[in-house]
Design a protein with these regions (language model features):
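Motif- and composition-driven signal specific to adenylation
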Residues: 1-128, 132, 137-146, 172, ...
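AMP-dependent adenylate-forming
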Residues: 37, 79-82, 97-237
Length: 237
C-alpha cells in the first residue's frame, strides 16, 4: 500500500479535502477525532462520500457519538476503531473496534490494551482499582514507554514512576486522565484529573456536564468552566 500524507491546508475546506481523499483512493484513514468531527459538523459527507475507505482509526480526544454516527451512516461497511494513548506511550495503548451504532448518552469505550502495553487504574491512595465502575487515574506501561522528558528531570520525576511489587518492578506513566472499567470489561475514559472541581461540596467532572449538553439537538460542541468570582458553573456552546 502507499502512504498518503494529506496536505494540511485542505483541512480548512471540506470539499477539497474529500476530493483529495477520493482522488487518492484512500482505504485506511488514521485521523484525530476532531478532524472526523469537523467534516461531520460541516456536512462534508453530504457533498461526497469517500467510499474506498475500509477502516478508520481515530484518537486524540473523545469522539462525540452523534458525529461518529454520521460517518457510520455514510460508510456502513467501514470498520471504525477508537484509539487511546498519550504521546508518552508512543503513541496509543488501547483500542476498541466500534461494532455498533451508539446512541446519545452512551459512552464509547477506549477498549483493551495493545499487546506489549499494560494499562491500570490508581486511586488517590496509589492503590490499584479493580472494582467495575470505580474511577481511577489511568496509568500506562510497556515496551514503548518513553524514557522521560528531554532535559526536564522535574517533570520526568513527577509523571514517570516505578511500581514495586515484591521483587518485580516496572516503570509506568501517570497520564492525568481518569477512567474506569465497565461491566463489559472495557476501559472507559472519564475526563482529566485537572478538570475535576469541587463546587458547593460536590466533586464535579466538567467534561461530564459538557457531554450532557452536547446531547441537546443543535449543540455541536460545549465547554464548561467554573467562574470562581461568582461561584457559578458556566457553559459555552
Amino acid at each position: 500500500a502507499e502512504l498518503v500524507i494529506i496536505p494540511r491546508h485542505l483541512f480548512s475546506t471540506p470539499s477539497l479535502l474529500l476530493d483529495y481523499i477520493c482522488y487518492r483512493k484512500v482505504t485506511v484513514l488514521i485521523w484525530a477525532a476532531s478532524a472526523l468531527g469537523l467534516l461531520a459538523v460541516l456536512k462534508g459527507l453530504e457533498y461526497k462520500v469517500p467510499t474506498e475507505i475500509k477502516k478508520i482509526f481515530f484518537s486524540g480526544e473523545v469522539m462525540p457519538v452523534k458525529l461518529l454516527r454520521i460517518w457510520q451512516c455514510a460508510l456502513p461497511g467501514t470498520e471504525f476503531v477508537n484509539l487511546y494513548g498519550p504521546t508518552e506511550i508512543t503513541c496509543n495503548c488501547t483500542y476498541y473496534p466500534v461494532e455498533r451504532v451508539y446512541e446519545d448518552g452512551e459512552k464509547l469505550p477506549i477498549g483493551m490494551p495493545f499487546e506489549g502495553r499494560k494499562v491500570f487504574l490508581l486511586d488517590e491512595n496509589m492503590q490499584i482499582v479493580t472494582e467495575p465502575e470505580k474511577k481511577g487515574e489511568i496509568c500506562v506501561a510497556g515496551e514503548s514507554l518513553a524514557l522521560g522528558y528531554y532535559r526536564n528531570r522535574e517533570e520526568t520525576d513527577k509523571h514517570f514512576k516505578i511500581w514495586q511489587a515484591g521483587e518485580k518492578s516496572f516503570r509506568y506513566y501517570r497520564t492525568g486522565d481518569l477512567g474506569y472499567r465497565g461491566a463489559d470489561g472495557n476501559l472507559y475514559f472519564a475526563g482529566r484529573k485537572d478538570f475535576q472541581i469541587k463546587h458547593m461540596g460536590h466533586r464535579i467532572e466538567l467534561e461530564e456536564i459538557e457531554a450532557r449538553i452536547e446531547q441537546v439537538e443543535g449543540v455541536r460542541k460545549c465547554c464548561c468552566i467554573l467562574d470562581r468570582r461568582k461561584n457559578r458553573l458556566k457553559a459555552f456552546y
